[in-house]
């Protein structure tokens, strides 16, 4: 069974070992322990792929098949996440969307944050939701916060400017503004979206 605890351990290990050439998952009493040591029962991941040398629970197998090969690849991966109601809505009529996801979805979202180098949002997400964009529901590292704010409308009243963590804002505005713990990167207005994409990559 996938739990908040074991998926957190897996994500945290993958995060720390992104540059490693060899990863191992050792199974002990139908559970798994992550290490770089050779054991009898293990899953061996090398540059040629994933080799399973033992039985593994289906759910953990699925996690490993998706996440661990990513470690061995050099190209960037992008993960999109959206929460919506059963009838396809992402907010109430008054714009309130806190929280449209349940607790399990929130834990999953924070798990994704813990393995990502950065989280990218638009200015309206900050203005309407006032999020922290940090990893809190599980143990894990925080991603770099990147905000796309073309007209530089944000002010220091939002949470992301009050917790001491760093932010990067992309804008094409000429407005001079001092935002706490924030690096503001000005790009030309023409082809702004494409230029942001190129910088993120």
Question: What label would you give each PLM region?
Answer:
Residues 2-86, 90-201:
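Active-site ligand-binding patch in enzyme domains
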């Amino acid at each position: 069974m996938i739990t908040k605890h074991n998926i957190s351990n897996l994500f945290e290990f993958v995060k720390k070992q992104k540059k490693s050439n060899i990863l191992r998952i050792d199974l002990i009493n139908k559970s798994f322990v992550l290490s770089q040591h050779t054991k009898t029962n293990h899953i061996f991941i090398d540059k040629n792929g994933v080799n399973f040398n033992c039985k593994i629970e289906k759910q953990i197998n699925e996690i490993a098949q998706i996440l661990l090969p990513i470690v061995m690849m050099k190209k960037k991966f992008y993960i999109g996440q959206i929460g919506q109601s059963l009838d396809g809505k992402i907010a109430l009529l008054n714009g309130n969307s806190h929280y449209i996801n349940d607790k399990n979805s929130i834990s999953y979202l924070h798990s994704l944050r813990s393995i990502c180098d950065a989280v990218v949002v638009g200015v309206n997400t900050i203005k309407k939701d006032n999020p922290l964009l940090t990893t809190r529901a599980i143990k894990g590292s925080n991603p770099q916060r990147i905000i796309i704010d073309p007209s530089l409308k944000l002010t220091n009243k939002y949470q992301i400017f009050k917790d001491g963590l760093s932010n990067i804002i992309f804008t094409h505005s000429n407005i001079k503004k001092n935002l706490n713990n924030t690096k503001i990167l000005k790009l030309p207005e023409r082809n702004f979206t494409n230029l942001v994409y190129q910088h993120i990559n």
